[in-house]
Regions:
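Glycine-/small-residue-rich beta-strand-loop submotif within the FAD-binding core of flavoenzymes
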Residues: 18-28
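Catalytic loop of the DD-peptidase/beta-lactamase superfamily, centered on the K-T-G motif
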Residues: 27-455
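Short, mixed-charge, low-aromatic patches
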Residues: 2-9, 24-25, 101-106
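Active-site helix/loop module of the DD-peptidase/beta-lactamase fold
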Residues: 1-18, 61
Length: 455
């Protein structure tokens, strides 16, 4: 492997630039991949790495380690699924794909990516085939490796996956009582929903839950199902996509599982059932409609998705709050993970610093929006404190804003308390028209001084 290890920023060399959806070019990404078990590498080197798992390749691992890393290692949960499971191998996203297994081949794959890049590696050890794809931006790298691998196998005269034939939509059938009792509240990685069965149309309808702080239009939109599934033979069918779902009830909780996910052929849980709280707790501050301002972000944060976060409560599901995901309120200062069957979830913890409320989620620390000072007409000077915490300011009335910042400082503006930014100092000019109600994020080193003129 000739181009792996230290980043291009250290060793020098060419990289693909990153552009956002509006065509703005960002500076090279700053990210640590080694701590997550990642590689700073090129597609060519990834293919060499993939070949190290093949018989006859330049093996890095011992024979016994290779045997372990290539075999399926299912969890007890996997045995409850009707079909195969993903993430059932040591370090791989999958160690077998059913469509290849039918022809006696093992195909392994691993995705990787950052905010600026998408990467996928797929290997077929028996034939010493490895495919790696890296895109600048968020793209379907996994789909690309699948298609390239299929083409390679075809070129070599090897039997590949059989083409998927279209299936006639099944007729709706009455829903058995054993399913009807599974109606209720469910969560996924992002939100809570309500599942309701319709006996007349033989459908399962999934609705997003509204929060009291939402406007009437948003509440009306949530009266329409985000998913409508027709029952037939114990499965629930989405005619629009061709996807099929089933309920898994053999665990301590209930899951709605997608059967044979396209491209992978494996079953993936999509929703987990949760129970309403008989005696719901509340957090020590009102969470619904509250905006939280990050205090410990680096000036080099690549994309501002986590800088400004809106928390919500559910009117029909007291005792739960939504921050990054859904949390069940356990005490006035703590919310536990509700979607315990899914990855990338976190608890939330409230605490006070200097008399003001704060929220911690994973490594991120937030203050409530009321800590933001107000920018006045004329010149405003903002200095980063001795602890290096981010500063925030709000704009009461709209106007033209001129910004002067230190060399490594960062300024991002969010319009009217919306989480989509309108200005970012690393790609935009120093002057901008700002609507009233905007929030201004400032990051830098302790003692850094920013000058903002509002007129």
């Amino acid at each position: 492997m000739r181009n792996s290890g230290e980043s291009v920023g250290v060793t020098g060399g060419k990289i693909a630039e990153f552009y956002d959806e509006e065509g703005n070019k960002y500076p090279p990404e700053v990210v640590t991949v080694l701590g997550a078990g990642g590689l700073s590498s090129t597609p060519e080197d990834l293919c060499r790495f993939g070949d190290s798992f093949a018989p006859g390749g330049m093996n890095i691992l011992s024979d016994s380690s290779l045997k372990d890393v290539l075999k399926e290692q299912p969890t007890p949960f996997s045995s409850l699924l009707k079909g195969d499971a993903l993430l059932d191998a040591f370090g791989w996203d999958y160690a077998l794909l059913p469509a290849y297994r039918e022809n006696g081949y093992q195909v392994l794959g691993k995705s990787g990516g950052t905010l600026f890049y998408s990467t996928n590696l797929q290997i077929l050890p028996q034939e010493r085939l490895a495919v790696a794809v890296t895109y600048s931006g968020q793209a379907g790298a996994a789909k690309a490796t699948h298609r390239i691998m299929e083409a390679l196998m075809k070129d070599k005269g090897l039997p590949g996956p059989k083409p998927v034939s279209p299936v006639k939509p099944p007729e709706p059938q009455p829903i058995p009582d054993e399913f009807l009792k599974l109606a209720g509240f469910y969560v996924n990685t992002q939100e809570a929903v309500r599942m309701i069965f319709d006996n007349e149309s033989h459908t399962l309808n999934v609705y997003s839950l509204a929060s009291p702080s939402e406007d009437e239009e948003a509440k009306e939109n949530k009266e329409k199902p985000i998913l409508s599934l027709v029952h037939n033979g114990g499965l629930f069918h989405d005619f629009a996509t061709g996807y099929r779902y089933y309920f898994l009830t053999g665990e301590k909780t209930v899951y709605l599982v997608m059967e044979e996910v396209p491209q992978y052929g494996a079953d993936i849980p999509m929703y987990q059932k949760i129970d309403p709280v008989e005696k719901p707790e509340s957090l020590s501050v009102v969470m619904d409609g509250r905006f939280w301002l990050i205090r410990n972000a680096s000036p080099f944060a690549q994309l501002p998705d986590d800088l400004l976060v809106k928390s919500e409560e559910y009117g029909d599901l007291p005792g739960y709050v939504k921050f990054f995901g859904v949390n069940r309120v356990e005490t006035p200062d703590f919310g536990a993970i509700a979607a315990t069957g899914f990855r990338d979830q976190c608890n939330i913890q409230l605490f006070k610093k200097d008399g003001a409320i704060r929220l911690k989620a994973i490594q991120f620390v937030y203050s409530s929006e009321d800590i933001a000072g107000t920018l006045v007409p004329g010149e405003n000077t903002i200095v980063i404190g001795s602890e290096g915490e981010n500063e925030w300011r709000k704009v009461e009335q709209g106007g033209i804003m001129s910004i002067e910042k230190p060399a490594n400082g960062r300024v991002i503006i969010f319009p009217r308390r919306q989480v989509e930014k309108v200005y970012d100092s690393i790609i935009d000019s120093s002057e901008i028209s700002v609507p009233g109600g905007s929030l201004v994020f400032l990051a830098g080193e302790p003692g850094d001084s920013f000058s903002i003129i509002v007129r």
